[in-house]
């Protein structure tokens, strides 16, 4: 069952859509996984969308999923084909990191209110993981402590060869690394799982692993999982488009959810 709610956003069209996907079977206090996309990302239940596909995998296991998409000027991503930079400027020109973070927090809170009858997990990819860490590790963050946080390709410092992206909207106002490091040290959650693709060209492995190491959790409550041959976005396996990275993520997550 699919439900859509629209929240007031901070920028552009002023809308933060949240799609809630409930499993066909299962009642009671089902776990909720709230998904946050990466910078300039698009997240929906549409077939072929990374977040929609992963949500369906978790749905089949009995979890409720909520997909949050942040506010922007336009939503016609397909118009720009592979020109990611043109898309970033057209859809997000003038948007700040703080605005994007506020959208993410609003989406998390609304999804938890609407569908969080069981344990609540926040799953953030790349920038979405940064939003999840800050929201759960800063005093003025979430109104609740999530049961668990899952990161996908999230670190506190990007590779030097990728620094050109820091001139793009949102990223050009991203806070210094020490803010994320402090949030990791003060993280309020019961469990932390981080996935990292061995072919990640955005974040060095050590900057992702350190966020897990810093979290104030027992060793058995935090995991850092390297998926061999997978890219930063978890869309390819050894250079070829593949859904396998998402299947690996879901296979790790399902036992933790239940």
PLM-predicted stretches and their roles:
Residues 1-28:
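N-terminal cap/lid segment of alpha/beta-hydrolase-fold proteins
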Residues 25-74:
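Short, surface-exposed "cap/lid" segments of acyl-processing enzymes
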Residues 48, 190, 204-214:
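Short alpha-helix in the alpha/beta-hydrolase fold that links the catalytic acid
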Residues 76-79, 219-258:
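C-terminal catalytic histidine-bearing segment of alpha/beta-hydrolase fold enzymes
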Residues 81-114:
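Alpha/beta-hydrolase active-site loop
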Residues 105-172, 176:
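Primarily recognizes the serine-hydrolase "nucleophile elbow" in alpha/beta-hydrolase
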Residues 158, 199-203, 232:
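Acidic catalytic loop of the alpha/beta-hydrolase fold
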Residues 187-188, 194-196, 200:
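Short beta-strand/loop motif that positions the catalytic acidic residue
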């Amino acid at each position: 069952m699919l439900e859509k709610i629209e929240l007031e956003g901070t920028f552009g069209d002023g809308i933060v859509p949240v799609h809630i996907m409930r499993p066909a079977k299962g009642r009671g206090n089902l776990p909720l996984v709230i998904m946050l996309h990466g910078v300039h990302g698009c997240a929906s239940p549409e077939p072929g969308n990374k977040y929609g596909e992963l949500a369906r995998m978790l749905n089949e296991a009995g979890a409720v999923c909520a997909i949050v998409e942040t506010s922007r000027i336009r939503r016609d991503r397909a118009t720009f084909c592979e020109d990611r930079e043109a898309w970033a400027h057209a859809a997000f020109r003038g948007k700040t990191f703080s605005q994007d973070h506020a959208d993410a927090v609003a989406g998390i809170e609304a999804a938890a209110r609407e569908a969080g009858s069981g344990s609540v997990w926040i799953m953030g990819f790349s920038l979405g993981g940064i939003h999840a860490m800050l929201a759960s590790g800063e005093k003025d963050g979430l109104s609740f402590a999530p049961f668990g946080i899952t990161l996908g390709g999230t670190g506190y410092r990007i590779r030097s060869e990728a620094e050109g992206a820091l001139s793009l909207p949102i990223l050009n106002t991203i806070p210094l690394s020490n803010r994320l490091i402090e949030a990791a040290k003060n993280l309020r959650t019961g469990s932390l799982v981080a996935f990292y693709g061995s072919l990640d060209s955005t974040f060095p492995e050590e900057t992702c692993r350190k966020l897990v190491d810093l979290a104030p959790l027992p060793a058995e409550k935090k995991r850092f999982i390297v998926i061999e041959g997978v890219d930063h976005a978890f869309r390819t396996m050894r250079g070829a488009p593949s859904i396998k990275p998402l299947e690996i993520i879901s296979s790790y997550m399902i036992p933790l959810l239940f």
